A protein has these predicted regions:
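Divalent metal-binding segments
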Residues: 2-4, 8-254, 275-315, 319-328, ...
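Secondary-structure transition/capping motifs at alpha-helix termini
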Residues: 227-236, 258-266, 318-319, 342-352, ...
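Non-cysteine beta-strand/loop elements that form the S-adenosyl-L-methionine
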Residues: 265-285, 375-385
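Short, small/polar residue-rich loop motifs at catalytic or cofactor-binding pockets
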Residues: 20-21, 268-269, 473, 504-506
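A structural microfeature
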Residues: 10, 509-510, 519
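His/Asp/Glu-enriched, well-ordered alpha-helical/loop segment
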Residues: 181, 314-324, 328-354, 358-359, ...
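An anion/phosphate-binding loop that grips the pyrophosphate of nucleotide cofactors and donors
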Residues: 41, 373, 486
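Short, solvent-exposed loop/turn segments at the edges of secondary structure
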Residues: 48-51, 232, 270, 351, ...
């Protein structure tokens, strides 16, 4: 590969490239494998900064400093880790944990009694792995003004009518977030958080990554522009403006997005807008069609009211923005497809590439409709491993769980698609994500929907050029072609030569960004 000015000048033999003139030969990767820099089409910058809080997830997980945090298999273990962290906090600080998910604990739900036992005086907040639910203790409920008379959808209650401390979706969580300052978002755009994210991305071979909910705050924008412009910052960032932040005011969001676009440079690309229609399947807040949740749980929560979605989609579509729309359940997917269809009928637009994010329960008919409308999908392949067994037994049941995150069906329907980690929901690692799509093995080893497996080549396309396409960046990244950024992932082995089962274990040896080789940073 010949590189000039950070871009790919040519690809071929030394003889075929000789016409470009003299060159300095860099053969440091002579015994490695170069592939296009990996593209994470759905993640969030807090994947780095979240580690300033206490990890209380079920699965083992490695932090940016290299420490392996053991997964917690009981409520008692969660409480013990929280108590250990609480003992080191300043007296007036809020204790914040993240990564918890009650679905792994045989039907038991966390409530105020569990967290009051951690601290009866200090406010305690535990964000679920999905980021769509949280648990808080009695002091936090009191400070947030949430009591038995609070009338907000998503405030769950105990048998005596008092709040249980479990808050489902953004309206219910807002009184708490308002007090603690939305730390799960702001840590992502702090300088330390950005640098930690860059380190994690580089370990994973990622050279382009999204921040798929960005509030466009002035301080965060300034930090993003400054840090990403540093020559050795190892990843290109593609943020999406959070429509939710602007409370149904598209004009205000679009004005702020236009300000952000003025900061764009080679490693910062504003222009997308994120809408969130429903919640989390494993949190039972996603909106699903008949026959509903397998365990009989009531249907989920509309984060955007159906009566409002058309107006929002139309406004952003008419403004020329590309929409990335969170739909987990198939009822939410149907609503989003219909909203995009109506927007296109009113205002036809070529090559819009509006993308449904997660899109986990879409069926073949919905994928065919998406293809006819020029829509894309970004499927949450990692869910198969982390929550596949729970979906099989509790949320969707065998039939529907076997067709979740249906990459093969999307491909047959002609829908351009990518696959993702949604980090920090699951760890950033596109080779693992590709492994999930190619193998569809759950954490117990069950194959969940063998007919929805895709080949390794298709899975790798989904985390390179496929993801770039969904971001409108396929002219710049995603493949090793003349004119594109000279971004590469350096591997120890050829991912197309190892068995599909070994794809997740191919070591990343380094990355190249704009022609600059970057050694893996220690940590």
């Amino acid at each position: 590969v010949a590189v000039r000015d950070g871009r790919i000048l040519g690809v071929g033999s030394k003889e075929s490239l000789a016409g470009w003139g003299s060159a300095e030969v860099d053969d440091r990767y002579a015994d490695k494998v170069l592939m296009p820099g990996l593209v994470e089409g759905h993640c969030h910058l807090p994947e780095g900064g979240m580690w300033k809080f206490v990890y209380v997830g079920f699965y083992d997980r490695r932090g940016p400093d290299g420490r392996l945090w053991e997964g917690l298999k009981s409520f008692e273990a969660v409480a013990a880790r929280l108590r250990e962290a609480e003992s080191a906090l300043a007296p007036d600080a809020t204790l914040i944990g993240w990564g918890f998910d009650p679905i792994f604990f045989e039907g038991r739900r966390m409530d105020v009694r569990d967290l009051d036992a951690v601290s009866p005086r200090r406010p305690v907040v535990v964000m679920h792995a999905s980021m769509h639910l949280m648990n808080v203790n009695t002091p936090m409920l009191a400070r947030a003004g949430i009591d038995r008379d609070t009338d907000i959808e998503g405030v769950t209650r105990m048998e005596n009518g008092e709040p249980s401390g479990e808050l489902c979706e953004f309206a219910a969580m807002f009184p708490v977030m308002r007090l603690i300052g939305s730390p799960f978002r702001t840590v992502g755009v702090s300088e330390d958080g950005l640098r930690m994210f860059g380190k994690v991305a580089q370990w994973a071979g990622v050279t382009t990554a999204t921040d798929l909910v960005n509030e466009l705050g002035d301080e965060g924008l300034a930090t993003l522009a400054r840090v990403t412009a540093e020559p050795d910052y190892p990843v290109r960032i593609v943020p999406a403006a959070s429509a939710l932040t602007y409370a149904g005011d598209p004009a205000r969001c679009l004005a702020k997005l236009e300000e952000a676009r003025r900061l764009n440079h080679g490693k910062l690309h504003f222009g997308m807008v994120k809408l969130v229609v429903d919640g989390s399947i494993q949190g039972f807040t996603a909106r699903v069609r008949w026959p509903g949740y397998y365990n009989g749980a009531p249907n989920g929560i509309w984060v955007i009211a159906p009566s409002e979605l058309d107006t929002l989609v139309q406004a952003y579509h008419d403004a020329g923005a590309q929409l990335h729309i969170h739909t987990n359940g198939d009822e939410a997917t149907q609503l989003a497809i219909e909203a995009v269809d109506r927007a296109l009928r009113r205002s036809p637009r070529r090559d819009h590439r509006h993308t449904l994010q997660h899109c986990q329960m879409a069926d073949a008919a919905q994928f065919r409709r998406m293809a006819s409308l020029g829509m894309c999908a970004n499927l949450f392949a990692n869910h198969i491993f982390y929550w596949g067994d729970a979906h099989y037994a509790l949320t969707m049941g065998p039939d529907r769980a076997n067709r979740m995150d249906a990459c093969a069906t999307a491909a047959r329907a002609g829908v351009p698609f990518s696959i993702h980690s949604d980090a920090p929901i699951t760890p950033l690692g596109p080779l693992f994500t590709a492994w999930c799509a190619a193998n569809r093995r759950t954490s117990s080893g069950r194959v969940l929907g063998e007919s929805e497996r895709i080949g390794v080549d298709a899975a790798l396309h989904a985390v390179t050029l496929g993801a770039a396409y969904t971001l409108h960046l396929d002219h710049l990244v995603g493949s090793i072609e003349v004119g594109k950024y000279a971004d590469f992932c350096v591997l120890e082995d050829d991912p197309l030569a190892v068995p599909a089962e070994g794809l997740k274990d191919v070591p990343v040896a380094g990355t190249v960004i704009g022609g600059r080789p970057l050694a893996l940073r220690e940590g």
